[in-house]
């Protein structure tokens, strides 16, 4: 698939350039601190196949440090069932093809903007899920960002202020943590290839903890202005023991517009690296 390759190569060339320029984004910098209270095998390793933990009231917990498989970040359709296709509205398919032809040069994340929902579920960086009464918070290492999911019984607002992460409310349905989100701005990208979404977008995520070390997220994308019907993808999260998220300051090392000057907005630094 040409669009996947070109978007991927653009990202990889950018990463390589940042490394050569002294960008300090390295897995070797991650902290090494034993995670207390988790099941372990006889050799001391985290037992990722142990039963899923539960809170005192018997509900599963999704708290912990996780990373996605990242198989959907370049191409969200990898999470669809075989034979399914994205049900584009004609204008949205045309916009997507334009972004493919431009090698996704207008990707908001290239300007250190957060990926939004559900794209941030796919990025190849860790994120920490924290559960507190009335609120689940997700701390993303990528772009040093966070997301709030309100679990105090409130409804989604009727006229929210448009935002990259939207507005999210959550509830438990059996063993699934169900998150509904709306209130997005009109420049959301669903993946690195540039599949679009807009202010009519509504995302439903169902988090199911399979065992101690794995969570499956079933994601429904419903945007009637952009797609002709709702459609679904699935991603898997992997538990990361004995470490933590680290600081990620995108703007300190952002040289994207010097590498790809024709994507730069007015006033951005371009030219020599």
Q: Regions from the language model: what does each represent?
A:
Residues 24-273:
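PEST-like low-complexity, intrinsically disordered acidic/proline/serine-rich tracts
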Residues 11-24:
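Bacterial N-terminal signal peptides
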Residues 6-7:
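Intrinsic, low-complexity polybasic segments
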